[in-house]
Amino acid sequence: MVVIRLSRGGSKARPFYNIVAADKRVRRDGSFIERLGFYNPNARGGEEGLRVALDRVNYWKGVGAQASETAERLIKQATQKTAA
């Protein structure tokens, strides 16, 4: 089963997350099928904090992928940002 979830990167005390489509059986930071965007919780000033390829997210959901709660929240946030 394919899931859309966050994969942690960055360094200690400076997290950075990739939003990825991955097989449910693979570990959190392991291999993934496709990178769908990123989330930087420590974005400051003019830095981009969130980017999501909504067309690819819709494709993966269309073929049965399920998003984690946090990924779903970020996707909704990106959708509202795009609509505004």
From Swiss-Prot:
> What Gene3D superfamilies does its record include?
3.30.1320.10
Q: Name one GO biological process term.
A: translation
GO cellular component terms, semicolon-separated:
cytoplasm; small ribosomal subunit
Provide any one GO MF term from the record: structural constituent of ribosome
Output the Pfam families linked to this UniProt entry: Ribosomal_S16
Keywords, alphabetical: Ribonucleoprotein, Ribosomal protein
Q: Is Ribosomal protein included in the keywords of this UniProt record?
A: yes
For this chain, the annotated S-S bridges are none
NCBIfam families the record matches = S16
Q: Which family does it belong to?
A: Belongs to the bacterial ribosomal protein bS16 family.
Q: Which HAMAP family match?
A: Ribosomal_bS16 (MF_00385)
Query: Any idea what this protein is called?
Result: Small ribosomal subunit protein bS16
